[in-house]
Amino acid sequence: FDAEDSGGIDGWDWIQGSTHYVSQLSTSRIASINAMILVDMVGDSELRLPKESSSTRSLQNDIWNIADSLGYGNTFLDSIGTPILDDHRPFLDAGIPSIDLIHVPFPWYWHTLEDTPDKCSAESL
């Protein structure tokens, strides 16, 4: 979604693209969506994914159980992280089960000139 990180720019709020997208969905379309899985910031070489605290818990548990059975228990942490204002929020607000797969804490170079491709890991991706 576009304009996810636009908050702070004069006249803009956060998560603009996903908010607009969900606002355009019909009631029947919303009812037809089983889940929304947001994959955000998953390229870090030291990837750790706690359970983002505003995400749908049952969906998280399903995904984390699958990850654990596939040997990714060291990445998908059995701990609750902080709530993140992210593109899953409008879907949650519309009643769609949603999770945010996001690496936290954010690395020191996040949103700086040092946030470059060399920080990404093919293994994490």
What is each model feature region?
Residues 1-58:
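Acidic/histidine-rich catalytic neighborhood of metal-dependent amide-processing enzymes
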Residues 35, 44-125:
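Active-site-adjacent substrate-binding region
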